[in-house]
From Swiss-Prot:
Family: Belongs to the PsbT family.
Organism taxonomic ancestry: Eukaryota, Sar, Rhizaria, Cercozoa, Chlorarachniophyceae
Listed transmembrane segments: 3-23
InterPro entries: PSII_PsbT, PSII_PsbT_sf
Protein name, as recorded: Photosystem II reaction center protein T
Gene Ontology BP annotations: photosynthesis
Membrane disposition: Single-pass membrane protein
Source organism of the structure: Bigelowiella natans (Pedinomonas minutissima)
Cystine residue pairs: none
Recorded GO CC terms: chloroplast thylakoid membrane; photosystem II reaction center
Length: 31
């Protein structure tokens, strides 16, 4: 159970950082 919680927190932090960088700059990769 602890491993699942740690993986969830890791994915959550990476997701927040990714979305913050993605929405901060214009999406140049899609073009």
């Amino acid at each position: 159970m602890e491993a699942l919680v740690y993986t969830f927190l890791l994915v959550g932090t990476l997701g927040i950082i990714f979305f913050s960088i993605f929405f901060r700059e214009p999406p140049r990769l899609l073009k």
